[in-house]
Amino acid sequence: MGGCVGSHHDSSGSLNENSDGTGVALGRNQPLKREKPKWKSDYPMTDGQLRSKRDEFWDTAPAFEGRKEIWDALKAAAQAFESNDHELAQAIIDGASITLPHGALTECYDELGNRYQLPVYCLSPPVNMIEEKSESETIEVPEAPASEGQECQLRLRLSTGRDLRLAVRTSDSVQQMKRRLQTQEGVAATSQRWFFSGRPLTDKMKLEELKISRDYVVQVIVSQPPTTPPLPQNPTPVEN
């Protein structure tokens, strides 16, 4: 998934040199290259699944090593880079004093020598992306009869920071459980993205197929419409 580890320094205090004998130190800063990484996912991925994977990384990466303000800067730089705003991405990197030994966001260092690694899926979509069906094209999943499956409590952790238990049946599909959460908490089913152990859960998956133990937590990413930041106001001059 990528992450942050301590950088490796030699006895002179500089980063180790390349093994090709060029003598170019890995710690020497290089400008951000414009080329985006090309990669293929292990399975065809929709835009929603890619967003879930990215959200999971950015939600958990700062919890390991490194400084949160650097992770925030790297996230902003990655978003600008993917949007082809190369100048903004470079400005963010320079402003946070981030070093790129290879000119790529896949390996970065802060001023303290901490190493940060961004996975390629945070920088560009895979070559095997597939279109996500619109709501009108989505096949309705029939509700399971109330007599089918066993009743149980499913532990959920919402991206809003709330933990809760949801009354479900083992025969429920993910789509049906989304509707139950919508009824209980008022969270629109279409704005929910569920994943368990880093795996996106599709609407047709059945709870009994997922083999989720009682003590495990299913994470729910709730998509929220972007808010427009308020325009800065001119400060009122202070009279002497």
From Swiss-Prot:
Stretch list, region Disordered: 1-48
One GO cellular component this record assigns the protein to is: cytoplasm
InterPro entries referenced in this protein's UniProt entry, alphabetically? DC-UbP/UBTD2_N (IPR032752), DC-UbP/UBTD2_N_sf (IPR038169), Ubiquitin-like_dom (IPR000626), Ubiquitin-like_domsf (IPR029071), UBTD1/2 (IPR039869)
List where Polar residues composition bias occurs: 12-21
From start to end residue, where is composition biased (Basic and acidic residues)? 32-41
Q: Name one Pfam family in it.
A: UBD
Which superkingdom? Eukaryota
Please give the name of this protein: Ubiquitin domain-containing protein 2
Q: Where is the Ubiquitin-like domain?
A: 152-227
First and last residue of the signal peptide: none
Q: State the organism's lineage.
A: Eukaryota, Metazoa, Chordata, Craniata, Vertebrata
Q: Which cell locations does it reside in? A: Cytoplasm
**Gene3D superfamilies associated with the record:** Phosphatidylinositol 3-kinase Catalytic Subunit, Chain A, domain 1 (3.10.20.90), Ub domain-containing protein, DC-UbP/UBTD2, N-terminal domain (1.20.225.20)
Sorted UniProt keywords: Cytoplasm
What is the organism of origin for this protein?
Danio rerio
